[in-house]
């Protein structure tokens, strides 16, 4: 008789607990920092820097394998990908900052 009661309590507890996802960890970077880097990467793109060279520049900025560097790689992939086709230096920064602030 105790086993069904335990199962019932477990189900009630699970149903009452809210499930939510945490935003992607930023490490020591703020959303302003993410936006500033997006603008910097977009400037590189507008200056004709190829993606491979931009990765080399990122390695010089952040030689360690950190959460910050992973985030910066994601930003660079967006900037040098299809999204970057319609961005300016300013809009890249503001878009990435807004996305960061909304937890994306």
Please provide the spans of the model-predicted regions.
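Hydrophobic alpha-helical segments
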Residues: 32, 40-41
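Cleavable N-terminal signal peptides
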Residues: 8-9, 19
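Bacterial N-terminal signal peptides that target proteins for export
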Residues: 1-8
């Amino acid at each position: 008789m105790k086993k069904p009661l335990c199962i019932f309590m477990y189900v009630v507890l699970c149903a009452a607990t809210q499930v939510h996802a945490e935003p992607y960890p930023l490490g020591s970077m703020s959303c302003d920092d993410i936006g500033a880097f997006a603008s910097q990467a977009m400037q590189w793109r507008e200056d004709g820097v190829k993606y491979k060279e931009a990765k080399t520049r990122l390695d010089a900025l952040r030689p360690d394998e950190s959460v910050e560097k992973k985030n910066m790689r994601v930003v660079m992939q967006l900037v040098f990908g299809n999204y970057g086709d319609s961005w300016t230096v300013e809009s890249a920064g503001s878009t990435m900052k807004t996305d960061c602030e909304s937890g994306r």
